[in-house]
Regions:
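Catalytic core and acceptor-binding pocket of nucleotide-sugar-dependent glycosyltransferases
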Residues: 42-193
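Surface-exposed beta-strand-to-loop junctions
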Residues: 2, 32-33, 131-134
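Short, hydrophobic/aromatic alpha-helical segments in well-folded domains
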Residues: 19-23, 38-39, 51-52
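Short beta-strand-to-loop acidic/aromatic patch adjacent to the donor-nucleotide binding site
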Residues: 30-45
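Beta-strand elements of modular eukaryotic interaction domains
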Residues: 25-26, 34, 107-109
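Active-site-proximal specificity loops/subdomain of glycosyltransferases
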Residues: 1-31
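C-terminal helix/juxtamembrane-tail motif
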Residues: 194-214
Length: 214
């Protein structure tokens, strides 16, 4: 794992486990219906001139993202086999959206919504079914033994429980986290640095698959 980003970081593993399931239990968050995860050091390239939470509510959306990309294979080797066994044990019927995250052989295709930008309803993760799933995953210690990220964990559950109509791609928001950016072609509201390379249709982006998925 030393060749993988954060592959030897215990602190990063703590963070991924925290955001996968524990953060919703914090008492300061108990009175809120929606949240928007914003990390330090990120850039927003567009003026956001509307209430994203109200928009989500008005349009019956439960989860929102700006970047979808492939996960590093070594970090999630056992995540899908364990998830598949969980679904079998609990006799959970998958929503059609789960197929977005699977290849033609029924295995995880590594696509996920990048959760450093995540607008969602708390109810997704407060659902007893999700807490049961998180507890099940946690027993396998994959957050530490492999470096499971909260992004693939959240994404798989979104695929299991939601329909595509409940998930929103914020196409009107330009954003950068670390070395990955997305730019919006709206000169009156958005300004992307010349150095930024739009990740939307990069070979490791899953956006094209999302836009084509029915």
């Amino acid at each position: 794992m030393s060749q993988v980003k954060y592959g030897t970081s215990v602190a990063y593993r703590h963070m991924c486990r925290w955001f996968s399931g524990l953060f919703v239990m914090h008492p300061l968050l108990s009175g809120y219906e929606f949240y928007w995860r914003v990390e330090p050091g990120v850039d927003f390239y567009c003026k956001i001139n509307y209430d994203v939470f109200q928009w989500m509510e008005d349009n019956n959306k439960s989860y929102g993202f700006v970047i979808s990309l492939l996960e590093l294979p070594k970090t999630v080797t056992s995540l899908w086999p364990i998830t598949r066994e969980y679904l079998k044990q609990r006799r959970i019927t998958n929503s059609t959206l789960l197929n977005f995250f699977l290849n033609d052989y029924g295995n995880y295709n590594l696509c996920h919504f990048w959760s450093n930008f995540e607008i969602a309803r708390f109810s997704i993760w407060r659902d007893p079914a999700y807490l049961d799933y998180f507890t099940y995953l946690d027993r396998w210690d994959g957050f530490y033994l492999e470096r499971w990220g909260d992004a693939p964990v959240h994404s798989l559950w979104v695929g299991i429980r939601l329909n595509k109509s409940q998930v929103h791609f914020f196409h009107d928001i330009g954003y950068r986290h670390d070395t990955i950016s997305r730019c919006v072609n709206d000169g009156s509201r958005c300004k992307c640095p010349k150095s930024a390379i739009n990740f939307d249709f990069h070979k490791d982006s899953c956006l094209a698959r999302w836009l084509e998925y029915k």
